[in-house]
Amino acid sequence: MRRNSSLWRLTGLATAVLRLPEEPGAYVLGASKQTLRRKIRLANRLGISWEEVEDEQERRDLLKLANSCERSHPDATYRIPVPGNDDLLDYRLWLVARAADGRPLLLSVTPVDGELAMLRYFRTLGWGEDQSQARYFMTEVLVERLVSLGVRYLIDGSNLFWLPNGVRHFQQMTGFHIVRVRVGRLRRRALPAT
């Protein structure tokens, strides 16, 4: 879309953003997060755990599994015949949720740059109750990890025009808000003549 197009002037760049708290533990506080807390407690009862993935071979194995799950998703809305995830290996922050038996349930890959982070990949690795609960559990895990890194904003760069209703509902439930981002050049102020 050209920057001077009518649609650009009308919408700017609209995207979902989660403003992160400054203090650890603050994300799940408040009445608006009651359902999120309930889902996290259920995930804990199911024995869901998480770990940060730093081993390159394990990352490649998880990427292979993620691509396979995208190609074979039972819901055509979420199925991606040719996943484009090779860039994930370029990013440092990899988190995985695991079932009580050790199976990977969800993969989260998030590029971080100062106070900003981009939700590049946040998908379940299979289908079922464990995977569903892992989404909520891992949202809190990701937020807490990002807060520890000094991140203030988590951006979901998904195309809002084509976002499935299930993902839109999940974003609202976890605290994402649609914001309009204006992209522009920094203007340098002229220094006074001496």
Where are these regions (language model features)?
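Conserved catalytic-core motifs of GNAT/GCN5-like acyltransferases
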Residues: T15-A16, H177-A190
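Short secondary-structure transition/capping segments
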Residues: L62-L65, G166-R168, L191-T194
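Acyl-donor binding region in acyl/amide transferases
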Residues: M1-W8, L29, D55, D113-I178
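Internal, well-ordered alpha/beta segment that forms a basic, Gly-enriched binding/recognition surface
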Residues: M1-A31, I48
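Short, well-ordered beta-strand micro-motif
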Residues: V17-R19, V96-R98, R185
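Positions that flank functional sites
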Residues: E58, F161, L186
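Flexible glycine/acidic-rich beta-alpha junction loops that bind and position SAM and/or redox cofactors
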Residues: G128, P164, G184-A193
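A conserved beta-strand-loop-helix scaffold within acyl/acetyltransferase catalytic domains
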Residues: E23-Q131, E140, R145-L146
